[in-house]
Amino acid sequence: FNEDGTLQDTHGDYLPAMRQLAAEQGVPLIDMAEKTKALYEALGPERSKSLFVIGERGEFVTHPDGVVDNTHFQDIGAIKIAGLVAEGIRELNLWPLTMFLR
């Protein structure tokens, strides 16, 4: 996060290239970078940590010495991200995927 509470962009040229390619190829794009950015910024630096595998010593059986993993999600984080994917499917009306959503 930046000092003003916005998420720091670490993707470089990847995101514009991804968006351009989707537009050129005429394929739908669920822009998860934008969706997750909005989620993380709404939660803020401290609350967004609850989505990831971040824990003190003894908190995770698989990481007895503690862990700071800003890439992989805890269950609650995975559920939130899956919800954003479902939201994108609905927004783009991606048939037949929409028929599998609740």
Cite the ranges covered by each PLM segment.
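Catalytic His-Asp segment of secreted/periplasmic serine-dependent ester chemistry enzymes
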Residues: F1-R102
